[in-house]
């Protein structure tokens, strides 16, 4: 069994969630509702939480938004959701925190962007106010630097110094270094202002995969703060999913990254929760965490001209996700369940035996029966028009038997061990 070594960091407590070092990598998401609409925002946070988001960031950009944060927190508490809220501040955060102190108290973490707090002495004062407010309220802070909103005075200073050097670097390399310096210098200022090191998380987001990997490798080697991973804008659909997976998987495999967000551009009509599902699947397929039972299914070939196995695989995946809101509480450990839905005799029986539960559907020209395997043993053979219903009933019974109060697999941990450096 492989062991992934995690980067050793300070551990940051955000309400009931611990971030950093050997703590599990945390999935974060962000609402796209108008925060001033407290009802709609609370409902979307509930939806994101139900999907598996462990922290949710909300925009706090106006007096109307700031005035509703405490109400959003109350609505969530009334619904039984303790999901930590992260306030996303840009440009006017210090004013909003001053005018609406209940906003700062209701949030669990502040996100501050050094690039748009302000310039010169005035900017320093605004940054200091936000940091002191966080410290007074015992809140964590993510100092989040972005490629597109980098502190221009810092960038110019570093560009000028680079031009004056005997061996100037390419401008893009200087910009990457400026991102890192901005984050580290801001963290140093925050500590001097009274914010403990174990209240600080850093991020340096860019939009290109290779740039993100390079920046985070360097940032991770130069500090002991937990790091939040994500592309600034991943894009839409498969492009966004592939880009996020490519970047984050490399860093996570190297032990870099303590919280993640998949910044997908939602396609028209697609649920906001997609970014949460993608984040879960990245962590689960890497063996870092388990969130929901996984379905193994073959890609199909000339032996599987029927779509029956594809439809069953989709039905099973949807069924498992829908049931998890109930199963998670009733059947601890069920998230590690592995189900195989295979399309023909070539790999079907073998993959089905390796899964906790598997079904091998008949391929083209094969006998129209579907053997079901449970814990490696052939259990029953299904046939007829009700294969899907009967197979889901077998899955349901397996979960109740094995993950119930006296189940042999209750609380069984199949996650690859994580060790801190």
Curated annotation (Swiss-Prot):
Cofactor(s), by name: [4Fe-4S] cluster
An annotated GO BP: isopentenyl diphosphate biosynthetic process, methylerythritol 4-phosphate pathway
Substrates-to-products reaction catalysed: (2E)-4-hydroxy-3-methylbut-2-enyl diphosphate + oxidized [flavodoxin] + H2O + 2 H(+) = 2-C-methyl-D-erythritol 2,4-cyclic diphosphate + reduced [flavodoxin]
Signal peptide span: none
Annotated pathway: Isoprenoid biosynthesis; isopentenyl diphosphate biosynthesis via DXP pathway; isopentenyl diphosphate from 1-deoxy-D-xylulose 5-phosphate: step 5/6
PANTHER family found in the cross-reference section: 4-HYDROXY-3-METHYLBUT-2-EN-1-YL DIPHOSPHATE SYNTHASE (PTHR30454), 4-HYDROXY-3-METHYLBUT-2-EN-1-YL DIPHOSPHATE SYNTHASE (FERREDOXIN), CHLOROPLASTIC (PTHR30454:SF0)
Annotated transmembrane regions: none
Described purpose of this protein according to its UniProt entry: Converts 2C-methyl-D-erythritol 2,4-cyclodiphosphate (ME-2,4cPP) into 1-hydroxy-2-methyl-2-(E)-butenyl 4-diphosphate.
Pfam families attached to this UniProt entry: GcpE (PF04551)
Assigned keywords, A-Z: 4Fe-4S, Iron, Iron-sulfur, Isoprene biosynthesis, Metal-binding, Oxidoreductase
Binding site for [4Fe-4S] cluster: 298, 301, 344, 351
Enzyme class: oxidoreductase
HAMAP family per UniProt: IspG
EC number: 1.17.7.3
GO function term, MF aspect, one: iron ion binding
Family per record: Belongs to the IspG family.
Protein's recorded name: 4-hydroxy-3-methylbut-2-en-1-yl diphosphate synthase (flavodoxin)
Annotated cofactor note: Binds 1 [4Fe-4S] cluster.
Upper taxonomic lineage: Bacteria, Pseudomonadati, Pseudomonadota, Betaproteobacteria, Neisseriales
Species of the source: Neisseria meningitidis serogroup C (strain 053442)
